[in-house]
Amino acid sequence: MSKLFQDSNKRMSRIVDYDEIKFDPLSIIGSGGFGKVYQGVLNGKEIGIKKITISDNDPNRDILLKFLEREIYTLKMLSHPNVIKFYGIAEKERSLFLLTELVSGGDLHWYIKNKSIDITWKLKVKIARDIAASMAYLHENGVIHRDLKSTNLLVAENWVIKVCDMGLARKMDKSEKSKMTICGTDDWMAPEVLIGEEYDASCDVFSFGMVLIELITRENLTPRIRNEDLGVDQKFFLSKVPADCPKELLRLVSECCKVAPSGRPSASNILGLLEYILESELIVNSGGDYEPPLRSFKPPELHLPLNEKNNNNKNNNNNNNNNNNNNNNNNNNNNNNNNNNNNNNNNNNNNNLGNSGNIYDDFSFPRPYQPDDSAVDNINNNGNDDSHFSFPRPYQPGQSNINGGVNNNNSNDESHFSFPRPYQPGQSNINGCVNNNNNNSNNNNDSHFSFPRPHQTSVVILNDRGEEEPLVVSQKDQLEHDLEGGDDNEEDEMKQLKSQLNYSKFSFPRPYQSSKIISFNETELLSFPRPWNPESEENNNNKNNNNNEKSLLEDPKYSFPRPYNPDSDSNLSFKSTAKVITNPTPLTTTTTTTTATATTTSSSSTNSKVTTNSTSLPTTTTTTTTTTATTSSSSLSSIGKPPQSTYKVPTTINPSTSQRVITIPSRIVTSTATAQPKSRSNSNPPKPTVVISNSNNNFNDIVKPSSTIVNQNKTTTQPTTLINAPQKVTTPVNKQIQPLHKSNESVTVAATTATTPTTATSTTIKSSPTTPTSTNQNIEQIKITTPKDEDENKSETNDGGGDTVSHRRSRSLDIKNSTKAIIKKFEELTRFSSQQSNLVHQPSSSSSSTKQPPTSQFLQNPRMEAKLSFAQETLVFEKSPSTSPKSLDIPTSSSLTSNSNSSIPAPSSPTKKTFWNKPKK
């Protein structure tokens, strides 16, 4: 019994003597879970030998022995074409050797990942059938493999699959589940094994489904193939499936990889399905019964032929003799021969050992470089004389002779498969020994697999004849050409630089550096665009003008976008459209003189009709008066409305001419010509406009506050002077009744308000004192006020004078009809007042007084009061007892308290008195 299993109760049969086994320790064909696999011979039959070594100090010794014992026990009881055959075990020096049949094709995983091997669908079904047959055989014998995967499936001749590596196999009852050790490989393990639940033989079915996924997709399994339930992600799996995959295989994968163990088919059912598919030829295979060749594992030849060894020894001896002769020129020939013989003997032994290890055949196992340190005095390092399949290794620099020996460094004799390395400069001999270093001679000999370097483009130049055929020269020749083309003054410097340029093909590549200075104009279009520079532009323009060449930067298409330069750039032309809104500009003060003469006449007929006509105003220009025109900027708030303007024309009054003051409202418009004057110059001031509005049947049958009434007295012969000035009046709300004074000579009509005064404009007309009185009744004073506009949305405040002006459209612009309506009202007033005076009061005897009494006196005399309301307008009129000519005021608002030009002061404490009393019967 084996010493390893001497404590085991199981009988270890089939024990083979180690001396019966013949194998080379270098003939490794693979590795398993517990050791390496070698190719050997047992009784003239090729076998596979699995070497397992377990040291006494290994902490997992007991576990490893347990699984090893289980594998041996399982293999010796199994015999199936799809299960690897067991021959016995052997032991030597605490190592155990498992003897099995030799499967030279390798594992299935190597064929799956190597996509250059064409595996048809029919062959894949055959592979799946063999795996299912082995699995059904194991399950029938109560064995669970628990580590079924593609690396544990070997490919024998004729593509027969054999299951191996039974180290984790476990014999158990077929009908019961048990909680066993979590073992296996994660990518192939069933969900119940991963989470530590009880499992049975169905775990091998899940692993079989994962092997089918490898066969179909021919890709390595990754955790991405599993979903959150530890099953198979069908969506991801189907994305990797080829288009020509048989549906039967996809259905089989879906059934085998179910999460629930009870839903998976048994191994025997899987085997029957696959055999049915192969027999019925359900899979159409274009390749027929093609089977790709298998992977071969021929053991390597361990030694070189004798003639090749002798040639190597002779070369080494000659090299050593030459080196020794150079080192010992002062010694005798006998000493040289003795030294040569001794050195040759040592070198022969060392070289033979080195050559046997360094020069491999085509199937040697790759291994790293191992320097030979046995010969210290004389190192013949032939490590770089590699075979075609030697392991690639880094560059080993020439080792210096520490003890004064001879150093033959042939490190630069590179093989075609040597490790790529950068340029290594020659090493110096540390102790002054002779160093036959061949680096300088071999530096320029590039191997095909030398250190990679970037691509060096060739330079294209023109030949000396100026032809367009380019000459392709190397980088070195171009650089030398540039260096030789320098100036005479720089010849010494260029030669010195040229002497320093010792290029080697082993040197690290450097970018091309040309000594030629390329002008900017030659590469202008390819250079980076730059901003405009005025100084360089001028210099370039001057230079180009001299050379009759056009500057490249002159064209803005190739220059960098730059700011506009008014000196050199052309004028910018662009079209723009704008909606022009006329904004009145504040007018400056100008001077003008206007002398106006107005003739005012009044006449009365027998039925006491008063005739009022418009006043003709012939004007003349002098040099002594000024006109001030102001426009409020706030009037621009409403477009289309004319600005307020006030024109004030003071004049010099002749002694024989009385002064008449007329205030013209600024917002009175009767035509478009007067809405916005064309000119505000001295020669064309806006003319006052007379607007009288009247209606027939509603409450608007009144004179608007913007109206100007001019009465013409027929008896007046002397002209009057017009003075235009802004006045402040109050906006009437409630009208007060003023006393009425009636005489045979004059009639004065006045209206005032009792509310808070506001700004407004007024017009006052004063007649000449020299005007002779008429026997008819003369209208001395007329004041007409209107109530505030009831439509608040249509009213607007005049910013210049503060007037509250109504902008209602004039109902009639016919002056004749409007004048007739006013005259009719005055006739009714006059007739009514005359009747009341005759009935109640006596005529006043003081009618010849020349001075008009104040308004307060009128209020105290009830005998002189009268009132009449029409069209929501209250008119208070009075008859003056004096017959002297009085002034006529026509205000546009109700109050004259703030008007300095008013002839009648406002009453301080007005008292309401009514003259009307019913006549007593």
UniProtKB/Swiss-Prot annotation:
Which GO CC terms are listed, alphabetically? Answer: cytoplasm
Q: Name one GO molecular function term.
A: ATP binding
Could you tell me the keywords of this UniProt record?
Answer: ATP-binding, Kinase, Nucleotide-binding, Serine/threonine-protein kinase, Transferase
Q: Where is the Protein kinase domain?
A: 23-277
Active-site residues, Swiss-Prot/TrEMBL: 147
The catalytic activity, as recorded, is:
L-seryl-[protein] + ATP = O-phospho-L-seryl-[protein] + ADP + H(+); L-threonyl-[protein] + ATP = O-phospho-L-threonyl-[protein] + ADP + H(+)
Ranges of biased composition (kind: Polar residues): 643-653
Kind of enzyme, top EC level?
transferase
Q: Which residues bind ATP?
A: 29-37, 50
Q: Fetch the SMART domains from UniProt.
A: S_TKc
> Which Enzyme Commission number(s) are on file for it?
2.7.11.1
Cell cycle as a keyword of this entry, yes or no, is no
Residue spans with biased composition (Low complexity)? 310-352, 400-412, 429-445, 539-550, 583-638, 748-775, 842-857, 892-910
Pfam families the UniProt entry points to: Pkinase
The reply on keyword Hydrolase is no
Provide one Gene Ontology biological process annotation: signal transduction
Q: Which family does it belong to?
A: Belongs to the protein kinase superfamily. TKL Ser/Thr protein kinase family.
Its name, as the record gives it, is Probable serine/threonine-protein kinase DDB_G0275165
Q: Which organism is it from?
A: Dictyostelium discoideum
